[in-house]
Amino acid sequence: EVAYQPWQVYRQPGVFHHLPLVDYRFLRVLERLADSKVLNDYFDHNNFILNSFGGAVNNKTMDKNSYLKEIHRDVNYYIKNYPLMMNVLIMLDPFSKVNGAIEILPGSHKVREKPSADEFNTNNIQIVSNAGDVLFFNSYVWHRAGISHILDKRRALTLTYTPSYFKPQADYSEIYINLPDDMKNNFYKAVLGKSSKIVKNLDEWYIDYEK
């Protein structure tokens, strides 16, 4: 929960974008993912950065017309067989059929076109999991949040990663400046895009390589 801010009038209920802009401590979870074999293999051990960091809450009162309930993928571009983006879903509560666990369509990352509702409904799988589990999936995969039948909240963190040259959805690199000393290191400098920002002047272009 965060104190009311004017921008909250534009936010859909149950959807929280760019949580590190509200509190840098959300970034601590990135350290737990740093050595992920899935992430490193997906990006072929090249540099990758945080593209987005949000949160989602699902329960019976959530708007059934929310875009999270629609069949969607989290990237608008499609380049066949190219690792453009990786989704990371961190379950803060158990995911079950009654509280609207995520539904994904296996193999749908291999096609550009959106599947029909009938195809998705027939072939999707619902990811039932425990609190603390982490789901990695190709961002080309078509998916949606399930319908919750209970009032209890089903909470999750929703992250995406991209190659370092891909423009993030928020300028997370600016957060780095105000991080506590124990977080001012090469890992956060890289994953927040601080190391891959474009230069603003020639002084930055010709900076000492060691810096």
Which residues are covered by each model-predicted region?
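Conserved metal-binding segment of the jelly-roll/cupin
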Residues: 129-143
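Active-site lining segments that contact anionic ligands and/or coordinate catalytic metals
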Residues: 124, 131, 152-156
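Non-heme Fe(II)/2-oxoglutarate
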Residues: 141, 146-211
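Active-site rim elements
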Residues: 23-28, 122-125, 144-146
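Non-heme Fe(II)-dependent double-stranded beta-helix
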Residues: 1-71, 77
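A structural signal for short, well-ordered beta-strand segments
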Residues: 52-55, 88-90, 157-161
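Catalytic core of non-heme Fe(II) oxygenases with the double-stranded beta-helix
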Residues: 64-129, 166-175
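Non-catalytic surface loops within mature trypsin-like serine protease
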Residues: 59, 92-94, 161-163
